[in-house]
Amino acid sequence: MAMSLIQACCSLALSTWLLSFCFVHLLCLDFTVAEKEEWYTAFVNITYAEPAPDPGAGAAGGGGAELHTEKTECGRYGEHSPKQDARGEVVMASSAHDRLACDPNTKFAAPTRGKNWIALIPKGNCTYRDKIRNAFLQNASAVVIFNVGSNTNETITMPHAGVEDIVAIMIPEPKGKEIVSLLERNITVTMYITIGTRNLQKYVSRTSVVFVSISFIVLMIISLAWLVFYYIQRFRYANARDRNQRRLGDAAKKAISKLQIRTIKKGDKETESDFDNCAVCIEGYKPNDVVRILPCRHLFHKSCVDPWLLDHRTCPMCKMNILKALGIPPNADCMDDLPTDFEGSLGGPPTNQITGASDTTVNESSVTLDPAVRTVGALQVVQDTDPIPQEGDVIFTTNSEQEPAVSSDSDISLIMAMEVGLSDVELSTDQDCEEVKS
């Protein structure tokens, strides 16, 4: 029962684990494909002419100018921006107070009409859409927003839904401040924006992360619970089996102590050459050998058969169970570990004699005895005589000093059975317990 329960739990846990794994894997793939972002980088090429320092020139005079050109892939197109090139002169809001371009009335220092210009706006105070829209309404060719306050080199894909007709990019804070410093020195800066690299980035949404985490935790809890249950059941089963083995060993020791021991003497029939050898060591019997006589009338060397009986509790030859033959009921917990020829514990008190009933039971479980041997127990109970007069023959008696008392009814039934010659009378275990009282 315990093993079938463990196997069922094992199959259930394995099926649950596989289904959960496949389900979570498919969901993760679905979330990953659904949560993806496509964005483009932008090459930012700025050109400006920085006046060369001339000590001899006056404040109003002009010396030579040094032309600078810088091109870096530092920009990132907005989410709703058209992916196209843009060119123009970089300008900021006319007033330092309106540099953030959050006010719709913000004025830019735009060049003369008909010349393209690009608005440079710092991040902050309002949405990207508001900044881009305010510049677009004043006819800017493009809008460049530089990051402020976060990671200096970070750029993001700006969302600006509703303003989709103007190129809008974001550049890092250092690059934006560099251009601002040039404009504050009244240096004209021209910017040329071109499309850079296309990027496809996959994201896992927070919902999917939470779902996968919960699924994983539940899966681990189920697996852990199954493992704990499995090992607890395995530990309990092992302990119960060891305990049952110890109890069976104790019962076997008790049974062995009730078996007759005999010392072979010179001239006994066991020493003859035609007598069967010991079935355990396959050696013949010699004088002074100590033998153990089992209830089935088989005998073996004591040193050979005792270890066998402790482990198996059966006759090495006919497989008769000595616990059953002696009427020693094992503990109920030991039933699962008993041999298959044991059909339940016997009721009634244990007997110290081999009775006709017990011999008949042995006969049914594959042991064939002659009529004289099968009735030897009954003869001993009724007449207290030896049915085989030959010296050296063995009569199984666990205690020669104690003879069990027999009721008058049992005497009459046994005597009638022997007078009629019914040597094959079969007495049940319950009848035997009523007839023979220890």
From Swiss-Prot:
Q: Which InterPro entries match?
A: PA_dom_sf, PA_domain, Znf_RING, Znf_RING/FYVE/PHD
Q: Which CDD domains does the UniProt entry name for this protein?
A: PA_GRAIL_like, RING-H2_RNF150
Q: Where is the signal peptide?
A: 1-34
The UniProt entry's GO CC annotations, sorted and at most eight, read: cytoplasm; membrane
Parts of the chain on the Extracellular side:
35-208
Q: Taking the first listed entry, what is the main subcellular location of this protein, grouped into a coarse class?
A: membrane
Q: Name the Gene Ontology molecular function terms of this record.
A: ubiquitin protein ligase activity; zinc ion binding
Q: Subcellular location, in the record's words?
A: Membrane
- List the glycosylation sites: 45, 125, 153, 186
- PROSITE patterns named in the record: ZF_RING_2
Membrane topology, record value: Single-pass type I membrane protein
**A biological process (GO) annotation for this entry?**
ubiquitin-dependent protein catabolic process
Instruction: Extract the Gene3D superfamilies matched here.
Output: 3.50.30.30, Zinc/RING finger domain, C3HC4 (zinc finger)
Q: Which UniProt keywords apply?
A: Glycoprotein, Membrane, Metal-binding, Signal, Transmembrane, Transmembrane helix, Zinc, Zinc-finger
Zinc finger, RING-type: residue spans?
278-319
Q: Which residues cross the membrane?
A: 209-229
PA domain span: 81-183
Name this protein carries in UniProt: RING finger protein 150
Please name the source species.
Homo sapiens (Human)
